[in-house]
């Protein structure tokens, strides 16, 4: 990757000694885990354990440092404080300095190249994690040369530091400057004497050749620390102390400022009806029936506008009809009665979904004040409200720090420090101490108080105790324990000076702890300081990544008892792939101080050059514990962080919270997967090098656009590979091939996600080439960019281009992919990315988008990861939405909470008590509406509700016991609204399935095909809870089967009979038949593509108007339930013989089945054109945590069902096979039977008997008395059906047919219903042999019917009798059939064959579609197959044949016949012969030169072979 190192102006580059540094690097790199070099802190601990403080050697090491305590560093190391002396020292002792400081001598800094004193001192102690303070017992810090010359050499910086850092100058006089006379040259020799042959190297200074030089940290920079006596002040930071979140707040504020509340276009406050793009031919001749109500008028206006009529034109027409004076249409709006939804002025009526789905009379309301903002609009006060993220976030973290709490503790600390440093005389005068006798213990009580407050400060800050704090505490205690004789001549003064210095260092370490805490975590406070700059040092792009893992803070006591040691491992990852091998550290036990912690101080060096690291690289760290009993290593926690946030590297010391979740999701590792900036019980401290670098975009080569024309075979292969649609579905070899020919790819033969996803890596050259392709690519549609927001593309530039494309989508189009965009946030690099900016901005323009996004973000917070980012994004949305909308959303949230509590109580109650529990809990909902008056329905923001219909509420008897809740519509012109509230079921998968189905339906509508689909609303409102829209007048297929008797699922006329009972008029029946025809075809396609499983008659619903739809998508993508290894769902989709029976009207209109197959295949091929979009939508949900969508195999399943690589002919043939396979699958009926039997006991308790259906459904006018019924004849082909003519009292006649069994069931029904009345005797079912039984039965039945109709008036006019004779009427002709056979006259009875032929690349492809009106010579029904001969044909095999369709006069094949090596059509004849087994049925010869290619055509069949 390209990185730019920032250096100070006019800085000279030092010379490096390659041989020395190489030698040191070699030594450092080959250390094993047991040979990791010790730091000085461990050396001091060893010395302290062996040598008492009173030994003379310790006394010799006593020294003083001529450094004012107000300088912003702790007791600095030699080279930090006096660079020139260090330079001199290194020149005198090159060998020892090389061993001690490694990289430093190689770089060879001199004062001219060092940064300013502020940068030298700020945070220096943090970059010295293993160092000790200057004190009498620490031999590593030797005194500086005492000469005045030496001091003078550091005066420029020292004076500058004194000048700029002296906040409390009156105390400066109390700081004596002492100089030690100990020789600096003896340091290496003494270290060698004490440690043997081991080179002891300070971890924070130990760097290999290619590691970073330690510098100061940006986030812990303190340009000046507090001198003695100056308190540490904490100030409020409303925008947040974390610069990332503060920057996010500013970004969101700018977004809202760009949309003023006074802008009526973006802030209308109204909910606009959803529109979709559709071809005008879809409703070319359609007119809608519209009823218009007008303010201050009780009269309704009935109009029939054309579908292509614009809404504003309709308003103008209404005003023209009703107004007495000319009115401007611009001042009016049309709303949908019963809701708060408004039609969009510049759109046609037909483009509104409400008109597309609702074919009945639509009621609209005309109202004025178009320019008046709605009740949900933003107010001017909202424009001036500040955005403080901490006020909106609802974090539930354990360590939520209060500014007041920390300020209180800090005041106590400052007070005790002040008391400690007061002169003895002042202490006596103010009576602040009663323990003033004796030199040894005078200050001890105050020291104890100070240390207690230090402990409290650390406790408030998440029990974080840095090494600097610990060392300062130890130093303070040790100085007080030091005998007076060990100090200089003036013991009191000397000791006082040391106490002042140590307390100053303690304050400084606390200050730095607070500063680093505030910069690492999100707080609303920070310490008072002047921010300093950052030193960017050029260490070379060949440098290796290096950092120090310091310590783990606040280790739980249970861990300390259970685990004997702790270790960590770390690695780098990018786009879900590891970039390097895992690095591990040595295990160390827990140490005890103020709290339990583990001090590793482990330097990690990755053998990766800076320039080779992708910009979006992530560091993952896992923490392990070694079990004390089993000695096994257990994963305890983990965290992750970006290496280059905000285009720059991580600098200095940082604190990171860790999560206790089991395993890090490798494929989802991104900055938001675990927000380390949010405090948690465990905190990890990591010290990064203070050298920084900036990322620069690599320059791409644009001169490669001119290339030679690719070979034709190459283009064909590219197009073939591009049919995979997703790079996840391409093998490594195919991705290499596609990338090799990337310059030949364009939007006509490929897609951009596929091309960029085939890149071999993310090195600088490859990324440069990817960006070049990105710039010159032309998107075919914004939907194509969706694939660039998946987890495979972490590159920020690529994602930015994708968002730019998606931002061009219309508002209603954006709703179709909003759930995926919420998921795509997971893989953004920060909260200022273009996608995160788009999500709060688009809701400013649409209430519907804001409402949808709110509930998506609410639901997303229940996911295991990324919760913090979603909370912050939700806070931004609420800030932008304004007070009015937020109040409504708050009401909805309270409603959801109430329903969730009720659902849990009903579910947990016993079966007999559930009804009483529900009635009792409904009262809480009534109280809720008394308080808030009205509330919008979370399922649909356009619906406003004001109460509960108590009597209409109930619950379902399924496992989750979902509630049926009926709300009272707040709109007086609207009906009550019934919904299902589920508690205990995850509805996110249902939402996704319905979303994809809606996308398919939109694709059909855009192609002019209305499949009469019902896609009900579904909304997940949290963990395992949500709303489901109830479709009015819908009933499950199981209930229909149940009312047909025990074996209802096995009967073929069940569905037809039910529709006949509910649609007595001919036009109603035909409408229901048409709706079923289209909706059944649509659901066959969508359930096949999505692999919807667990299909049975309880998951299929029907409406009286004929619409069929599926519910419950808990099992999809082929994840079928199994019993004993056998799948329950063995059919590709649900299409049974009873559905075919209804479509073909009992087998009388077989051509309707052909039309059904044609419709299914057409719908299937339309959806296949949108395979890229469907697969992208699914791929973006792979990491949403859905139970059935988790991996590549699930995508492959949908891809295999879409078959984008097939031609339309091949896909047609494939889907036709699936239709036949489903039709012949008997286990489907068996499964329905099992479900029906399982529900019979439950339903029998609730409802008496099957006749209830007749009583409810067949409510006919009793004045329509049947005058007579005449049996005209019978047919043996369909179970001895008797054809009857029914004459009613109004002389209307109709035909119907019934079987003897149906007559018997009618008689049994009447016996049960009229048990007290005398009924005529029913004819016997048996007859003597050798008699004309059929004609005799006609006479018996005629006599029986006559007695029934002339008998009791109550019986003759009962619902069951009227329904029996007046339902299932027969249409005398097919002239008014709702099915249209394109290009054919249905009255033509001549035999025909339908073919479709294509010719390309010497290949002749023939699709044999259908045969029509074929019979055997004796008139019987054939079992036909088709034989095809190509004459002449060069190969020996000339004959090709289709499969046989048994016993059918209008068989459907949709089989493909292919002839290769056909060099031309001229001179070729296609001979087609139809046979039934070996019997000739018909034939035709076709001259291929005259055939219209790529068109369907019917060819007449002759009765002989020519």
UniProtKB/Swiss-Prot annotation:
Domain of life: Eukaryota
Domain PIK helical: from-to ranges: 704-880
Tissue: Expressed predominantly in liver. Also found in kidney, lung and lymphoid tissue. Down-regulated in BeF3 cells expressing the BCR-ABL oncogene p185.
SMART domains: C2, PI3K_C2, PI3Ka, PI3Kc, PX
Subcellular location: Membrane
Main location: membrane
Residue span, C2 domain: 1381-1506
Gene3D superfamilies according to UniProt: C2 domain, Phosphatidylinositol 3-/4-kinase, catalytic domain, Phosphatidylinositol 3-kinase Catalytic Subunit, Chain A, domain 1, Phosphatidylinositol 3-kinase Catalytic Subunit, Chain A, domain 4, Phosphatidylinositol 3-kinase, accessory domain (PIK), Phox-like domain
Function: Generates phosphatidylinositol 3-phosphate (PtdIns3P) and phosphatidylinositol 3,4-bisphosphate (PtdIns(3,4)P2) that act as second messengers. May play a role in SDF1A-stimulated chemotaxis.
Similarity section: Belongs to the PI3/PI4-kinase family.
This protein's name: Phosphatidylinositol 3-kinase C2 domain-containing subunit gamma
């Amino acid at each position: 990757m390209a990185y730019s190192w920032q250096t100070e102006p006019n800085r000279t580059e030092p010379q490096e000694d390659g041989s020395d540094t190489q030698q040191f690097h070699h030594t450092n790199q080959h250390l094993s885990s047991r040979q990791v070099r010790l730091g000085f802190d461990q050396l001091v601990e060893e010395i302290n354990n062996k040598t008492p403080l009173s030994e003379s050697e310790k006394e010799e090491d006593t020294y003083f440092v001529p450094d004012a305590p107000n300088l912003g560093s702790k007791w600095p190391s030699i080279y930090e404080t006096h660079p020139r002396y260090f330079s001199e020292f290194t020149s005198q002792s090159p060998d020892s300095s090389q061993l001690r400081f490694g990289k430093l001598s190689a770089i060879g800094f001199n004062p001219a190249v060092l940064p300013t004193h502020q940068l030298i001192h700020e945070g220096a102690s943090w970059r010295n994690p293993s160092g000790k303070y200057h004190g009498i017992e620490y031999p590593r810090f030797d005194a500086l040369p005492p000469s005045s010359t030496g001091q003078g050499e550091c005066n420029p910086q020292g004076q500058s530091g004194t000048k700029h850092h002296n906040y409390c100058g009156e105390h400066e006089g109390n700081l004596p400057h002492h100089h030690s006379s100990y020789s600096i040259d003896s340091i290496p020799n003494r270290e060698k004497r004490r440690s043997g042959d081991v080179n002891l190297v300070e971890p924070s200074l130990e760097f290999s050749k290619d590691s970073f030089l330690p510098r100061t940290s940006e986030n812990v920079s303190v340009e000046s620390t507090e001198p003695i006596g100056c308190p540490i002040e904490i100030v409020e930071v409303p925008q947040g102390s974390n610069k990332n979140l503060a920057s996010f707040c500013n970004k969101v504020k700018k977004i809202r400022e760009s949309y003023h509340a006074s802008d009526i276009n973006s802030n209308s406050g109204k909910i606009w009806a959803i529109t979709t793009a559709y071809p005008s031919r879809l409703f070319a001749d359609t007119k809608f029936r519209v009823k218009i109500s007008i303010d201050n008028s009780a009269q309704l206006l009935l109009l029939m506008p054309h579908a292509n009529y614009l809404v504003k034109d309709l308003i103008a027409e209404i005003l023209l009809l009703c107004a007495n004076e000319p009115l401007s249409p611009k001042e009016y709006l049309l709303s949908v009665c019963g809701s708060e939804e408004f039609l969009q002025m510049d759109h046609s009526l037909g483009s509104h979904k409400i008109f597309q789905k609702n074919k009945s009379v639509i009621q609209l309301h005309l109202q004025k004040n178009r320019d008046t903002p709605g009740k949900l609009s933003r107010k001017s006060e909202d424009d001036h409200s500040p955005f403080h993220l901490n006020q909106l976030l609802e974090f539930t973290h354990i360590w939520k720090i209060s500014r007041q709490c920390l300020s209180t503790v800090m005041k106590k600390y400052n007070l005790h420090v002040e008391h400690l440093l007061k002169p003895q005389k002042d202490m006596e005068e103010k009576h602040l101490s009663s323990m003033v006798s004796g030199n040894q213990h005078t200050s001890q009580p105050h020291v104890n108080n100070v240390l207690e407050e230090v402990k409290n400060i650390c406790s408030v800050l998440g029990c974080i105790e840095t090494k600097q704090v610990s060392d300062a505490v130890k130093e303070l205690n040790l100085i007080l324990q030091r005998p007076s004789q060990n100090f200089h001549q003036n013991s009191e003064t000397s000791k006082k000076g040391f106490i002042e210095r140590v307390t100053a260092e303690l304050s400084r370490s606390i200050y730095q702890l607070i500063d680093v805490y505030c910069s690492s975590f999100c707080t609303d406070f920070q310490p008072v300081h002047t921010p300093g700059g950052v030193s960017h040092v050029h260490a070379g792009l060949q440098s290796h990544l290096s950092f120090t893992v310091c310590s783990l803070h606040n280790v739980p006591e249970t861990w300390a008892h259970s685990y004997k040691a702790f270790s960590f491992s770390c690695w780098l990852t990018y786009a879900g792939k590891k970039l390097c091998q895992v690095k591990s550290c040595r295990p160390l036990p827990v140490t005890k101080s103020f709290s339990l912690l583990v001090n590793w101080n482990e330097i990690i060096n990755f053998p990766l050059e800076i320039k080779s690291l992708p910009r979006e690289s992530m560091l993952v760290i896992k923490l392990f514990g070694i079990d004390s009993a089993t000695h096994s290593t257990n994963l305890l926690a983990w965290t992750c962080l970006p290496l280059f946030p905000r285009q720059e590297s991580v600098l200095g010391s940082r604190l990171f919270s860790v999560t206790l979740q089991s395993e890090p999701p490798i494929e989802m590792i991104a900055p938001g997967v675990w927000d380390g900036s949010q405090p948690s019980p465990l905190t990890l401290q990591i010290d990064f090098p203070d050298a920084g670098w900036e990322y620069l975009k690599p320059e791409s080569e644009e001169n490669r656009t001119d290339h030679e024309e690719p070979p034709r075979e190459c283009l064909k292969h590219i197009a073939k590979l591009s049919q995979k649609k997703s790079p996840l579905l391409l093998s490594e070899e195919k991705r290499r091939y596609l990338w090799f020919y990337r310059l030949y790819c364009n939007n006509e033969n490929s897609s951009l996600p596929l091309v960029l996803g085939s890149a071999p890596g993310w090195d600088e050259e490859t990324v440069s080439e990817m960006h070049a392709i990105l710039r010159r690519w032309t998107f075919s549609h914004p939907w194509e960019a969706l694939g660039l927001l998946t987890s495979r593309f972490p590159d920020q530039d690529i994602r930015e281009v994708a968002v730019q494309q998606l931002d061009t989508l219309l508002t209603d189009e954006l709703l179709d992919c909003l759930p995926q965009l919420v998921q795509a946030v997971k893989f953004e690099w920060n909260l200022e990315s273009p996608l995160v900016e788009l999500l709060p901005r688009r809701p400013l323009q649409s209430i519907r988008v804001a409402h949808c996004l709110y509930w998506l973000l609410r639901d997303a917070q229940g996911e295991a990861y990324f919760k913090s980012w979603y909370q912050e994004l939700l806070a931004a949305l609420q800030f932008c939405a304004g007070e009015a909308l937020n109040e409504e959303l708050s009401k909805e949230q309270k409603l959801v909470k109430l329903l969730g509590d009720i659902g849990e109580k009903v579910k947990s109650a016993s079966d007999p008590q559930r009804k009483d529990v529900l009635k009792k809990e409904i009262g809480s909902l009534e109280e809720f509406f008394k308080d808030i008056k009205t509330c919008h329905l979370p399922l649909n923001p356009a619906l406003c509700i004001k109460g509960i219909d108590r009597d209409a509420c109930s619950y379902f008897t399924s496992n989750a016991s979902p509630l049926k809740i009926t709300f009272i519509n707040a709109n007086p012109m609207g009906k009550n609204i019934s919904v299902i509230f589920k508690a205990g079921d995850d509805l996110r998968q249902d939402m996704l399935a319905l979303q994809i189905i809606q996308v398919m339906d939109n694709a059909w509508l855009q192609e002019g095909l209305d499949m009469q689909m019902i896609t009900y609303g579904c909304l997940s409102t949290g963990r395992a809870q949500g709303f489901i829209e109830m479709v009015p007048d819908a009933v499950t297929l199981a209930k229909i089967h149940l009312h047909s008797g025990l074996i209802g699922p096995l009967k073929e006329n069940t569905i037809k009979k039910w529709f006949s009972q509910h649609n007595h008029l001919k036009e109603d029946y035909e409408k229901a038949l048409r709706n079923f025809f289209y909706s059944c075809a649509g659901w066959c396609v969508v359930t096949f593509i999505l692999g919807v499983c667990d299909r049975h008659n309880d998951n299929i619903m029907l409406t009286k108007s004929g619409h069929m739809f599926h519910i419950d998508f808990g099992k999809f993508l082929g994840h079928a339930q199994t019993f004993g290894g056998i799948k329950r769902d063995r059919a590709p989709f649900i299409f049974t013989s009873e559905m075919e029976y209804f479509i073909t009207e009992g087998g009388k209109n077989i051509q309707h089945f052909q039309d059904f197959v044609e419709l299914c295949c057409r719908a299937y091929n339309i959806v296949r054109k949108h395979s890229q979009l469907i697969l992208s939508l699914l791929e973006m949900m792979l990491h949403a945590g859905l139970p059935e969508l988790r991996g590549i195999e699930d995508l492959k399943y949908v891809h295999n069902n879409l078959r984008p690589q097939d031609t339309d002919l091949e896909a047609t043939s494939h889907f036709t096979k699936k239709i036949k396979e489903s039709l012949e699958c008997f286990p489907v009926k068996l499964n329905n039977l099992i479900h029906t039997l399982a529900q019979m006991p439950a339903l029998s308790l609730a409802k008496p008997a099957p006749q209830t259906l007749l009583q409810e459904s067949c409510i006919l006018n009793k004045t329509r008395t049947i005058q007579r019924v005449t049996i005209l004849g019978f047919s043996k082909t369909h179970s001895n059906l008797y054809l009857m003519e029914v004459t009613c009292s109004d002389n209307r006649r109709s035909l119907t047919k019934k079987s003897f069994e149906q007559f018997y069931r009618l008689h049994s029904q009447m016996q049960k219903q009229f048990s007290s009345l005398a009924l005529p005797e029913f004819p016997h079912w048996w007859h003597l042999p050798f008699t004309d039984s059929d004609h005799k039965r006609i006479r018996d039945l005629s006599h029986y019917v006559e007695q029934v109709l002339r008998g009791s008036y109550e019986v003759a006019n009962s619902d069951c009798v009227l329904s029996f004779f007046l339902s299932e009427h027969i249409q005398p002709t097919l002239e008014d059939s709702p099915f249209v056979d394109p290009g054919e006259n249905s009255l033509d009875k001549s035999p025909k064959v339908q073919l479709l032929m294509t010719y390309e690349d010497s290949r002749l492809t023939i699709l044999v579609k259908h045969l029509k009106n074929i019979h055997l010579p004796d008139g019987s029904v054939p079992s036909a197959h088709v034989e095809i001969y190509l004459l002449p044909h060069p190969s020996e095999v000339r004959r090709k044949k289709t499969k046989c369709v048994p016993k059918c006069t209008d068989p459907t094949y949709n089989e493909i016949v292919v002839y290769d090596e056909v060099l031309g059509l001229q001179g070729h004849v296609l001979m087609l012969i139809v046979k039934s087994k070996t019997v000739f049925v018909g034939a035709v010869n076709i001259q291929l030169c005259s055939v219209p290619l790529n068109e369907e055509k019917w060819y007449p069949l002759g009765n002989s072979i020519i």
